[in-house]
Amino acid sequence: LYGNTGTHDCAPATGNPYALMSEIGTPGFGLVPDGVSEVTVTYQIAPPRTVAVNRNFFVLATTSRTAPPCGVQWLDPTGNVKGTPIGCSFLTLESPELGEYRAYVAGKLATLQAQVASLSGAIASGNLAAAKSAWLNAHLTWLEIGQDDGAYGAFGPLGGDIDGLAAGHPLGTADPGFTGLHRIEFDLWTKRNLRTAATDTVRLRQLLGQLMKAPLPTYLPATAAGIGNWLLRPHEVLEDALRDSLTADDNYGSGTDLASITADIAAVRTMLAELKPSIDPVAPHLVANASAELDSLMSAIGATRVNGAWVSVEDLPTRQREQIDADAAAAAETLAPIPDLLTSTGSNSPD
């Protein structure tokens, strides 16, 4: 597919450095092999278009479109994809947004380190109530990163050590491999043991120090796979909330699962704001719809608080719990198409 333009952003699989179509309205055209009935042209910042093939030739006339195409799929008579000779790369578009997210994560990690230091001080002072409050602040900051252990966490096993669950460890909560924020939660609420909490907080500080040693691009690389995983995260964060928090599987005594979900929502809102410029051209209503659903979820959670205190998921009336489940599921479903909308096709797709 060729056109009259000087941009070299996209090129045929042969390596010919011509753009696929003019950005100023000159028709694009191309030849296809036998058996191809239609051609779908994909764009990075506009919905795809499908045009008919006539005697192995097709024309894509556009008098007003300003988005250059960057991918082509050949379709057989049944509409199935017969081949993808050219693919779009999302690396150019999403790399700046990933950079914004990295800066956000760096700020949260710095805050988290200070909060864990405060937690350590509260434990050392023997003030259980202050230690619980400091723990909650730290835990919510971690979740606001959007990196809890199941959400395609970029921090890998280290992230699991910082905020992993006892499930999967042979000895459960007694297993030495169960470390991090939830281990300290178990110490403070279930065991009410400040001495053990102090030891486990030292370990948490070591884990955070280890995490901070490597540059963030190590964990959040601007590669096809790295960006692909990041694009999964808005949906996966809420899916984790449905699986772990709304079932109370990650409650080790604090009863703050609903507070955790508010932090998850904050993480999702941040990522949506960063991705909005890329999402809007291909799905104009997605961000607005997701934001409205997140508002409903926040309202449903807010309605559960009693005199400002958090209520455990297990203690919620059935109607309130079902409403929160439904709102979280609706938002997660709305967010699910983001990777398909923004990832690339053909030879440029993630491995």
Where are these regions (language model features)?
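Functionally engaged cysteine thiol sites
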Residues: 6, 10, 88, 235
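Extracellular ectodomain segments of secreted/surface proteins
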Residues: 3-29
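Short intrinsically disordered, low-complexity coil segments enriched in acidic
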Residues: 2-5, 45, 89-91
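Mature extracytoplasmic or organellar-lumen-exposed domains after removal of signal/transit peptides
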Residues: 89-351
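Ser/Thr-rich low-complexity repeats and stalk/linker segments
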Residues: 23-25, 35-88
